[in-house]
Amino acid sequence: MKMKRHYGISSASIALAGIVLLVSGSAQAQKKSKYVCDEAQPASMCTAANTCGSASAPCTVDITKSGSSSNVKPGIPNAKNNQFFCVKSGTTVVFMTSNKNTGFMVSFGTDSPFDPDDPIIGGANKQITVKASTPGCYKYDAGAFYSGATYGMSGGSKPELVILP
């Protein structure tokens, strides 16, 4: 009698362990990266609703400071802070801030998609105009700061940008 009961507990334990492994394995398979640039074809995520500017109209990118963080908002209707957006190659992009007495810096590292590929450093009275030139998907750092602030620059954000051919 004890032998059968022990066997029942063992088979139930094995079945439960198998179910747990199966569920966790399928959850890992469905888990996607939160970054668009990690997708196989990030350009396929571009739509008219998330494409900024055109050959005849510049794309404005507003970099603001909010508490201890910074936000990047493209000039797209209903845009959200730090959202992924697209720009067609050849489009003029204007980096600016709508915050008074605020500076900003944008860094693409060693592979900037813009011409000129100098660091993008500006402020409330100094917009920076560049031209999108190198197609691809880019993760970049953006930060904002107040002149004379005790804690200096805000925490950077890590938004993404696709330059379309």
PLM feature spans:
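Bacterial N-terminal signal peptides that target proteins for export
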Residues: 2-14
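Bacterial N-terminal signal peptides
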Residues: 13-23
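Sec/Tat signal peptide C-region and signal peptidase I cleavage site
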Residues: 25-29
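N-proximal, low-complexity, solvent-exposed accessory regions that precede a main structured/catalytic
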Residues: 31-45, 49-52
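N-terminal edge beta-strand
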Residues: 48-92
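Short proline/glycine-enriched turn/loop motifs at strand-loop junctions of beta-rich domains
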Residues: 97-103
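Short, surface-exposed beta-strand/strand-loop-strand elements in extracellular ectodomains
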Residues: 103-113
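Extracellular/periplasmic metallocenter environments
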Residues: 118-165
